[in-house]
Amino acid sequence: RWLEAVLRLSALASGLCFQGPPALGRVLRPGMAGCLASVCPCFSFLAPPRPESKGGALAAGGKEQAKWLDTSYSGGLEAYIGNARKLLKASKLGENPLEGLTPSVPTGERLNYGDAQFQAFEDRGLREAPFSAFVLVAGGLGERLGFPGIKLKIAATSVTGWSFLEYYCRGILALKQQHVEGAPSGPIPLVIMTSDDTHEQTVALLEESDFFGLSREQVHVLKQEKVACLSDSDARLARDPKDTAQIETKPHGHGDVHALLHTSGLARRFQSEGRRWIVFFQDTNGLFFRAFLATLGVSAVKGFAMNSVAVPRKAKDAMGGIAKLTRPDGSSITMNVEYNQLDPLLRATSCPDGDVADHTGFSPFPGNMNSLVLRMSDYMATLERTRGIIAEFVNPKYADSSRNKFKSSTRLECMMQEIPQELPPEAKVGFTMFDTWCSYSPVKNSPAGAVEKFKTGNHPQSGTTGETDLFAANCRILRLAGATIDPPVKRTFNGIEVDLEARVVWSPQWAVSFAGVRARLAQDAKVQITQRSTLILDGDIILEELTLDGTLIICAAPGSRVTIKRLVVKNEGWELDPASKDDPDPEVHIKGFSIRRPAGATCQLAFEEPGEHVVSPAPQWPGMAKHGVTFNEKEPQRERSEAEESLPFYRVRSMKSSFGGETEAPLEEFARDFPASRR
């Protein structure tokens, strides 16, 4: 029997009949599996079960699963287990993977939103954007947040209902509208990495929404596979507690995105199309586009092979820090260091006090928000050399001091931001840091978890702040562009106190950059907005004079250009009501508020015909005030019919290729239920 085992294993190893470890159950005679398991712990799942076990040796389904696990990992299960043993041994001995490295503050750019330097980098980023490909790492469900679905389906803002996925797709569409000489002729590609948990829902959301305006050909959905779990420090494969005939599996980490881009051939395809940059971002940050373009501009100007979007980070905050790590031979690498490694590393080397604040009140090591810009040429060279496989780590929770058994199974993991470890030594790696208000407000925590973070003085990073921070950023940007907006008021939602600004939201089709916002406000524009107001702008709309105290929605379909010459809107408007515990809507639960939209409390202007449209003063009528719409109170009033009385009026001058002139039309002809008009 032993001779037979040796011969069969030799044949397997030589590739003559190798089908991976799952095939062993078929090629070994009965009883041999137990012999093999006794001398080779990694095949312990083939051994007969202990009496207390509910399952037997891997059933047919389990063996098929093992075969699948073998083919889905580069090098197969043999390589996976070999890597696991090395890392588990180092973990058991307490070895530090950063041993011998000395941390220091890396090279990067610190930008202030809206100033001249920021605008210069953003302008360069706009010119580089059509040469980019985008990769959205979206493997997460919203269950931990209290949302029953994929996180990409959560509304980035409740006032419009745009999901995060729609918001990102519309942003990519807007970037393609920047006409740059020499840019690839095709659409800007979007790659979405999903998981077993999110793949079907993500594809369904794209299908039912007609890809949010993107073409099917430009969207690529790649599913990440799971890896086998390990039961102890000998890297024995763990049985699934829910089905002991199966191997337990867990996600490998978002670092798999690099291998998927390599094996799918997409990275090479993008390079052949003339793409210079590949941009990685994550699934629930509504402020991503506010900072991304300037980061791309910094990469182009500074020649960064990799550039991380960063934010100021509180000392010892549970957020990875970007650091320059110098080796004993003088060479160095700039990369993310996890917060639980950074402080002890500093104490052991250059800073006895560890990770402490500097004169700014923040740690000198910028916070990593996992938005990355990589130069395609360097990235492709790295993929070709590594096949997209990046450094792995293991994080077991030991059951006792022997450090042999685990409290629960573990697995190997890898992180997307670890790619600098694989870049060539000469590659220039840096960061671009922005204030948090304009760049980073992810939806990461449940309402209960967010309250705890709020109580300790940390940012809640919840559904509540994800939306209210977007309002605040938009109001601040409009003020920088010349608008006058009332200051915020204190409100509390889900136990979190926020500074609630006017609910100002615009689509990327209105503006995707600060320069775009400034261009949408005419020179010497007079825009005044009260704090209780809601303003939604979608499309090619120029504001010259607008006074808003209430709710106003303006939509311009593609090909339509709207100029607001003068418009005064005062109506009941929309209100944010604190959520009721009994509210069945999960989005209301995670955000902590619902939006009350009383009948007749909204002024909607929707322009669906192509051409130039100008909204200017029109004659008044006695019933106009109740609709909250005025244009020029000094103009004479005129009587309206009973049918007209229910509709606000305005004057619109349309200048189209086929005709011109002025027409006066009821609002109903231009207004449609939002958001249907933009579809």
Residue ranges, per PLM feature:
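N-terminal chloroplast transit peptides
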Residues: 6-18, 22-25, 32, 37, 42-44, ...
